[in-house]
Amino acid sequence: ISTYLVAVYSAPYKSFYDVYQGLDGNDSMKIEYFVMPEHFEESKIDFADHLDMMKTLSQIFGEYPFIKEKYGVAEFLWNYGAMENQTITGIGYAFVGGYDFFKDTYVHELAHHWWGNSVGPKTWNDIWLNEGFATYSEALYAEAKHGKDGLISKMQSKFSDSFRGTLYAPKDLFGETVYEKGAWVLHMLRYEIGDSSFFKSLHNYYDLYKYTNASVEDFKAVCEDVSGTNLDKFFDQWIYTGTENILCSYTFEILKTENGSECTVKLFQEPQDYDEFHFP
């Protein structure tokens, strides 16, 4: 266990639990919820989807890495904060109250048990492998529940004008670049190598580096091995290179044809002093 994931929660908690049945049908474990007594009934609404989240993420990434131990959630006094302490996620008290509104946070912190807790970053320069992956997991869960519309809606909510800088060795370890640009770069990688190769890469990367540490280059090597694609340019442009926002201007022309109309759109990258960026 990484030292930053160690925590002790202490309070006059009341608790309840679900039981998760592992993918192989043999292993099972409790998902236990520890809440302040005054939030006990409301928390059953807030945490109602955790069992489904566990099943869904296990199906996407591979079995929950700590199924021989446990998973749980503990309410703590950090207002709107949350932390993926290993096997017991801390959830700020402001999230608890029967709101059924903070699913993204719950998915994000659970996803860290694959990306960050089980497969840890080799250095803090590789923090994208934690936070970008956990943020994209929110979109993958939305896709699993609501199809492509859910995926698109969730990714649109992650769009920010603060994508400046690199994902590798970022200036702000826990800024929007790492989280939101990180999720978008994974989304782009998915379309660069295709769904089959992308999800197989996630499985292989998890299996290969489970309970150890990995770097961006380790992840890149797995993706290249699975897809048979040279990803040097993709990683150089989107992960190692820091830029201002890459914007586009456009012109269009509509011409009448025998069968109707034909529209020609031309996109121009701005600013133009960067190399031409490749979009899948």
Q: Where are these predicted regions, by residue range?
A:
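Amphipathic alpha-helical substructures
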Residues: 175-265
